[in-house]
Amino acid sequence: MAQAQIGTPLLTTRQAEELHKSILAYLSSKNLASTAATLRDELPDLAEVTFDTEKAKKYEGLLEKKWTSVVRLQKKILDLESRNTLLQSEIDNATPSSLSRRTQDPTNWLPKAPPRYVLESHRLPVTCVAFHPVFTSLASGSEDYTIKIWDWELGELERTIKGHTKAVLDVDFGGPRGGTLLASCSSDLTIKLWDPSDEYKNIRTLPGHDHIVSSVRFIPSGAAGAPASGNLLVSASKDNSLKIWDVTTGYCVKTILGHVDWPRAVCPSHDGRYLLSTGSDKSVRLWDLAGGRDAECRLVMFGHENYNLCCAFAPPTAYAYLAKLAGLDRPPPLGASAEFMATGSRDKQIRLWDGRGNCVKVLVGHDNWVRGLVFHPGGKYLLSVADDRTMRCWDLSQEGKCVQTLTGVYEGFVSCIRWAPPVVKDADAMAANTKSGGTGPLADTVVAARRRAATVGSVNASVQIRCVVATGSVDGTEGKVRIFAN
């Protein structure tokens, strides 16, 4: 009977070589020459290894970084185990009424005060936030020139990213098949790409705009004429242009002109076919990317009386509610995109538009500039934040009635709002993602499932709404990020 092999290696040959080089670099940095020489003698793969300047920089401090990463991971595991024990205790001792609160329908969940966490570290106002599509990571950008990465589940700061030389104005996660990237844009006229799988290393800088870059978004794959890999990024700038970039090459593949003043915000439709842009010329423009080389401006909408600051496409889950506002006999097909849109402005108003360019509703209630908008994934609500220090929730099933106003939570202007992407419950997809470390083709299963859910306009059995909202604000002179969660 064959015996089990003893000492089966846990690392691949390449991983072992990298570990050996890291140990050698560590010993060399500590001036332990004899120990390093002994290691070279006993490990054949190190015999010919020499460290030039570039290679030394690559391995310098790598062992320490890996060690501290393991320590942080162990702490997270302990914290999660503690939370799991607490939740299990709550379930064991729960009454039927408390269980019903726990299992409330996520399509009706709205953020409540107080927030779960108030995250403090930025020295100046927070301008933007973005959720990682898979992990519990949140990026925030600030006028202090930095990006900070938080674990929103634990309420902890993970790292500070430096690279921009002026205010960071927008951030977004996305990217090509095989790995999620973080994109950022700034008043320094550049867009930067960061790799979350490599300690958020700056892998590319995209110059090309001639003025402030105020908005950046990854374009979902599936657009007609767009690569299936999802490697396109759109940006908006004070140079009056929109630009589309290929993040794998760093080249600008399309410049879109039409705005006569600063297009402050841009967002793509869920299928990547359309772009919505708006800004200081008070116009709202709908662009069709299906035409190939040139983007076609399908609609130009006017109605706001001051600069427009934000825009959003309605998800298909909202079509049934918005169709009634638009006076339609039946809602558009769930597979359609760009059927309804929302914009917010310095005129303190939010306007809802249909796909024919008609303003179907004006939402009035904010007392100052409307800075950010996000549709509830369930489609029933629209959330907004403004310089009046409030977050408002508008019920689209009640003709856009404001059904909730969060006051007393913020000490200053509220600049941005994002909703966490849904959870993929499919066991195979999650297992695949875990094995691939959140990158690679297996991880794409998770992202693809979310896109399918958006396309069909409903949250199916394998995709669940995540009741987590993040906002950014200025409190005094400092910026704060607030996490609202169920």
From Swiss-Prot:
What organism is this sequence from?
Sordaria macrospora (strain ATCC MYA-333 / DSM 997 / K(L3346) / K-hell)
Instruction: Report the family membership.
Output: Belongs to the WD repeat LIS1/nudF family.
What protein does this entry describe? Nuclear distribution protein PAC1-2
**One cellular component term from this protein's GO annotations in UniProt:** spindle pole
According to the UniProt entry, the coiled-coil residues are 70-95
Tell me the organism's taxonomic lineage: Eukaryota, Fungi, Dikarya, Ascomycota, Pezizomycotina
Describe where the WD repeats fall, as residue ranges on this chain: 121-162, 164-204, 208-255, 258-297, 303-363, 365-404, 446-485
Q: Where in the cell is it found?
A: Cytoplasm, Cytoskeleton; Cytoplasm, Cytoskeleton, Spindle pole
Q: What is known of its domains?
A: Dimerization mediated by the LisH domain may be required to activate dynein.
State the gene name recorded for this protein. PAC1-2
Q: Tell me one Pfam family matched here.
A: WD40
Kindly state the subunit structure of this protein.
Answer: Self-associates. Interacts with NDL1 and dynein.
The Gene Ontology biological process terms listed for this entry are:
cell division; establishment of mitotic spindle orientation; microtubule sliding
Recorded GO MF terms: dynein complex binding
Free-text function comment from the UniProt entry: Positively regulates the activity of the minus-end directed microtubule motor protein dynein. May enhance dynein-mediated microtubule sliding by targeting dynein to the microtubule plus end. Required for nuclear migration during vegetative growth as well as development. Required for retrograde early endosome (EE) transport from the hyphal tip. Required for localization of dynein to the mitotic spindle poles. Recruits additional proteins to the dynein complex at SPBs.
Question: Which UniProt keywords are listed?
Answer: Cell cycle, Cell division, Coiled coil, Cytoplasm, Cytoskeleton, Microtubule, Mitosis, Repeat, Transport, WD repeat
- Could you tell me which residue ranges the LisH domain spans? 15-47
